[in-house]
Swiss-Prot record:
Free-text tissue specificity from the UniProt record: Expressed by the skin glands.
Positions of transmembrane segments: none
Family: Belongs to the frog skin active peptide (FSAP) family. Dermatoxin subfamily.
Protein name, UniProt field: Dermatoxin-J3
Keywords: Amidation, Amphibian defense peptide, Antimicrobial, Secreted
GO-annotated cellular components: extracellular region
First-listed, main subcellular location of the protein, grouped into a coarse class: secreted
Function text: Antimicrobial peptide.
UniProt-listed GO biological process terms: defense response
Subcellular location: Secreted
Modified positions (Glutamine amide) in chain numbering: 32
Organism of derivation: Phasmahyla jandaia (Jandaia leaf frog)
Length: 32
């Protein structure tokens, strides 16, 4: 179903966003 598909996409985007945020935080800490 479309709802299930969108939920799956949301999960993937949330996971990617978390990884990117973690990496960005590491870069900021390294830059200080």
């Amino acid at each position: 179903s479309l709802g299930g598909f969108l939920k799956g996409v949301g999960k993937v985007l949330a996971g990617v966003g978390k990884v990117v945020a973690d990496q960005f935080g590491n870069l900021l800490e390294a830059g200080q």
